[in-house]
Structure formats: C-alpha cells, structure tokens
C-alpha cells in the first residue's frame, strides 16, 4: 500500500518521465478489477484527459497525483501501481487504466489487492484524499513538537502508541511499513499506552517520526 515516502517518490518519478507529455488516448480496464474504484465511469476518462498536458505530479499522504493543464488531476492510492512504458515497449495485456501520450509512450495503472484511480479538478470530495492533502505533513516544519503533542492529547489515554500512529489517518501516509522502524528507533513498544509516555519519550517519538519518514523518502 502507498505510504508517504512512496507517494512522494512516485510523484518524483512521474515528473521525471511524463511532465510535458500530452495525452492522446485513455483506455479503460482491459482486465476489470472489482476492487479498483473510479469516481467516473472508466470510459469517461478519455473525454476528461485526452488533449491535456502533464504539468507536474505531487505526493501527499496515501496519494500520488498527476497534474495536467486546465487544473485537471488524476490521483491514485493504496495498491495502484503506475508503470511508465516507452514508445518501443510492448503494452501490457492487463491494466485498469492506460494513458497514451502523443509521443507514443504511455503509463499503465494496475491494481494489487485494491485501490482507486480518480480524475477531478480539485473538487474530489473523498475523506481520505482531503485528509491526505489538508493535513500537516510530518516532513514539514509545521509538524513540530507542539503539533505532535496536540495529536497525542486528542486520543484516549488507553490507546496504544501503534494505534495512535497508524490509525484514523492522524498522520496520513504513515502506515505499517514506516511504523515498525519508527518505534524501533524510538525504543518504544508498540503496545505501550499513550498515557504512559514521558515528555522525553514523546519528544523522541516525534523526532523519529520525522527522521524515519525523511530517510525513507530520500532512499
């Protein structure tokens, strides 16, 4: 599943490979997947995206997002895997969405387990998307000790540290993949109750959230 470091790196890879390319065609699923969700009928993505040029890409929370001219965006999450395909490469037989560009290259999106691929113009009213894009990222200066302690104070004292970090999208993009490293580096058992943490342990935990996510993003 996509976590924050991967979301950011996927966006970086897409900027490097498809920025400046114009969509010539959009193909709906060649192999329908009952756990791949769209916010429009897949056949409508052709009209929504064809003719638009990729201007950038962003990663936030549990989402990566392609940005096009005209304010059009294509976001995906969870088990959705984008694959860049060069002009000379054979297109995969199975995909959930395929964008073809005017230079003959393409991006194929496939889904492992489950995920969503949504096209919108900044008005995507999805709870997980809104939390991902609007929450303060652990990789920013705004995510300081004070903000982290506010999050800690907002949960029930009996909640485990593991549940605090990885549930309810309190820190979108922080999931099980990052969690174990954070707790190991902080020296805190995942079943410890939030109420049992000393101020020193809270500071160490905050620092490791930022450090581990930054390190994973840069790898």
What does each model-found stretch correspond to?
Residues 74-185:
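Phosphate/anion-contacting hairpin/loop surfaces
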Residues 2, 6, 140, 201:
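Catalytic cores of large soluble enzymes that bind and process phosphate-bearing ligands
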Residues 1-119, 127:
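Gly/Gly-Pro- and Ser/Thr-rich, intrinsically disordered tail segments characteristic of DNA damage-repair
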Residues 22-44, 58, 151-219:
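Basic, nucleic-acid-binding surfaces and adjacent catalytic neighborhoods in DNA/RNA-processing proteins
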